[in-house]
Amino acid sequence: MPDSINNGHKESHDHRISNDAEMITDEKWQAIINNDAAYNNQFFYAVKSTGIFCKPSCKSRVPKKENVCIFPNTEQALRANFRPCKRCKPTNEKMPDSEWVDLITEYIDKNFTEKLTLESLADICHGSPYHMHRTFKKIKGITLVEYIQQVRVHAAKKYLIQTNKAIGDIAICVGIANAPYFITLFKKKTGQTPARFRQMSKMEETYNGNK
């Protein structure tokens, strides 16, 4: 059933984090939320929901405290499979565009049920909206918006086939609050309305079952 989001990315980090990460103290948390450059090179913080690690002075959106883990150096953060922030460059090296786009798609795949905008994604994934839009299209061949739509329509197909949820409920489940817009988008991407897609899927299932 498509009710749960795949957390494989998070789990890939967790087995390494416990060995290398330090406890987050109030002092370090204050340094993070205040972007305190005085703590740069004293520690680095990683965000489990994005797979990115930063300097304390990074100007990106303040993460949820429960998603943060602390590393004394960049080597240990890298060893735990976190990748350096493209904005604050904690390793003083530029992250390859392909790796950055992988992080973005990974985040979308896990969080497509939420409200996603170019601005919010750029903030979460530590880049500028314009650069993110341009880089994503260069690597993937489609825009960020098109990719999000693709992921949502794919998830909607699963709901239509595997559940009896109402069309409006499915729209909400895949991150689209406006049911008429969802129906229009689904038809644009598949050539069928959601109701017609469900009907055809059931007919195909019945036909195959009677073979």
Curated annotation (Swiss-Prot):
MF annotations from Gene Ontology: DNA-binding transcription factor activity; methyltransferase activity; sequence-specific DNA binding; zinc ion binding
Q: Which cofactor does it need?
A: Zn(2+)
In the induction comment, the record states:
Up-regulated by methylated AdaA itself in response to the exposure to alkylating agents such as MNNG.
Asked whether the keyword Endoplasmic reticulum is assigned, the reply is: no
DNA-binding residues per UniProt? Answer: 119-140
The UniProt annotation places Zn(2+) binding at 54, 58, 85, 88
How many cofactor units bind, and how? Binds 1 zinc ion per subunit.
The catalytic activity, as recorded, is:
(2'-deoxyribonucleoside 5'-methylphosphotriester)-DNA + L-cysteinyl-[protein] = 2'-deoxyribonucleotide-DNA + S-methyl-L-cysteinyl-[protein] + H(+)
Superkingdom, taxonomy of origin: Bacteria
* Pfam families (UniProt xref): Ada_Zn_binding, HTH_18
Cite the active-site annotation: 54 (nucleophile)
What InterPro entries has UniProt attached to this entry? Ada-like_dom_sf, Ada_DNA_repair_Zn-bd, Homeodomain-like_sf, HTH_AraC, HTH_AraC-typ_CS, Me-P-triester_DNA_alkyl-Trfase
Top-level class of the enzyme under EC nomenclature: transferase
Q: Which GO terms describe its biological process?
A: DNA repair; methylation
Keyword vocabulary terms for this entry: Activator, DNA damage, DNA repair, DNA-binding, Metal-binding, Methyltransferase, Transcription, Transcription regulation, Transferase, Zinc
Q: What is its EC number?
A: 2.1.1.n11
Report the residue ranges that make up the HTH araC/xylS-type domain in this protein.
102-200
| Task performed by this protein | Is involved in the adaptive response to alkylation damage in DNA caused by alkylating agents. Repairs the methylphosphotriester lesions in DNA by a direct and irreversible transfer of the methyl group to one of its own cysteine residues.
Name of the protein in its database record: Bifunctional transcriptional activator/DNA repair enzyme AdaA
**Source organism of the structure:** Bacillus subtilis (strain 168)
Write the gene name: adaA
